[in-house]
Amino acid sequence: MTKLLEMKNITKKFGDVVALNNISISLETGEILSLCGENGSGKSTLMKVLCGIYPSGDYEGEIYFSGEKLTAKNIKDTEEKGISIIHQELTLVKNMSVLENMFLGNEITQAGITNDNKMYLRCKTLLEQVQLDIDPNTKVSALGLGQQQLVEIAKALNKQVRLLILDEPTASLTEKETDILLNLIKGLQAHNIACIYISHKLNEVKAISDKICVIRDGEHIGTQLAQGISEDDIITMMVGREITSLYPHEPHDIGKEILRVENLTAWHPTNTHIKRVDNANFILRKGEILGVAGLVGSGRTEMAQCIFGSYVGKYQGNIFLNNQKVKINKCAEAIANHIVMVPEDRKKHGIIPIMSVGKNITLSSLSQFCFGKKVINEPLEETIINQSIAKLKVKTSSPELAIGRLSGGNQQKAILAKCLLLHPNILILDEPTRGIDVGAKYEIYKLINQLAQEGMSIIVISSELPEVLGISDRVLVMHQGKVKADLINHHLTQEQVMEAALKE
């Protein structure tokens, strides 16, 4: 293989803050390099330097691509050289077709007129290359996230990409979609296309990479061959300390039944012939961590939403708290019964991005800080905010900072802080560590254990089986809306859980 990319002694500052400090990395033609590091470590900043988002002259150091010095003024310059980046937040225009997105700003023309036939055939060929069997005229809004990722890659191939950068590409994908994407990336190697792969999912990193590069606090910690480094080694390099177990599971007392769900059925919001939850029954005990496992679409989230009163469709069944039947038709009624839920999509349902960290934390519990019912006791609110930030270890320069500027892990910790101010007895966590770096995951796992030790009952819904098995006392297995198994987590394996989910 020949040298494709060299980044030499890259230093990037924002005022007096050094974001990147003398980082050097290299990449061969057709090689897959995974870039690992906690949120805020400098991974994205380094890629923005490479892609011309931070132009030449805005940083110190040199970049060479195919042996030539790269002096990009913007991202278009690097795209013309064959460097393409696909961000975690996809940039496709949802109300346009796949074809229109593919050639947006890059139309095939003849005598100044767009050649629709050539673009259609070219689009069809590119979609076949990424194993996507759809009509080019399909609206992007009609595609799933996995299909949209493949369209983004096809779009990059249309630009004659030689280096493809993927930032957290599988964060919102199903296991099947992830397998398709990883196989495609490996297949691109045969066409001498190199890849920089950014992910917190270390099993994927190990499976796909030729080399693994770790960045911490803007420093290059090291680059090693993937086959010569373990996941534990990567974690230690990322966080700067040894984590003996990613899933700290401290002993805690499990008490009497606190929640019982009987015959819970929920129908699709717009098609009542489809059951999202089908006659679900289970119990939850005081101080217990109950994991809920199952494939995407198994009804896990819908079941939790019914318990929390946030499900938008029709549902029926019985919910008992401390052996007393309760009616929960809206979130306020759940909160009044000391049930709180952290939603799956934190950006859409968990935070108000333009509001401050502090105001997001106290948003659901303002009545606790009021004189009478209308006037906020600001000194008391400020004290509670600072205590919550310290307790949850939310990393922020100020409580006044807009929460949208925090990393995913710190946003999630702020949401947890908000929920804990409601003093729940039952805490429901839906995908609590999705898109979060390994250090923040560890802190959230520790918090879950601490809360269980204090007597809180916790339901954890996760698509990551190692996570479910690592932190749960008991595992509820769901498939196609049904509770297929209720398993004590005594050395449970992933195979046992999947077998329980799929058995008839």
Swiss-Prot record:
It catalyses: D-xylose(out) + ATP + H2O = D-xylose(in) + ADP + phosphate + H(+). Belongs to the ABC transporter superfamily. Xylose importer (TC 3.A.1.2.4) family. Part of the ABC transporter complex XylFGH involved in xylose import. Responsible for energy coupling to the transport system. GO terms for cellular component: plasma membrane. ATP binds at residues 37-44. This is Xylose import ATP-binding protein XylG. The gene is xylG. InterPro entries: AAA+_ATPase, ABC_carbohydrate_import_ATPase, ABC_transporter-like_ATP-bd, ABC_transporter-like_CS, ABC_transptr_XylG, P-loop_NTPase. One of its GO terms (molecular function) is ATP binding. It comes from Histophilus somni (strain 129Pt) (Haemophilus somnus). It comes from the Bacteria. Keywords: ATP-binding, Cell inner membrane, Cell membrane, Membrane, Nucleotide-binding, Repeat, Sugar transport, Translocase, Transport. The lineage of its organism: Bacteria, Pseudomonadati, Pseudomonadota, Gammaproteobacteria, Pasteurellales. It is found in: Cell inner membrane. The complex is composed of two ATP-binding proteins (XylG), two transmembrane proteins (XylH) and a solute-binding protein (XylF). It is a peripheral membrane protein. It is an enzyme of class 7 (translocase). Residues 5-242, 259-500 form the ABC transporter domain. Its EC number is 7.5.2.10.
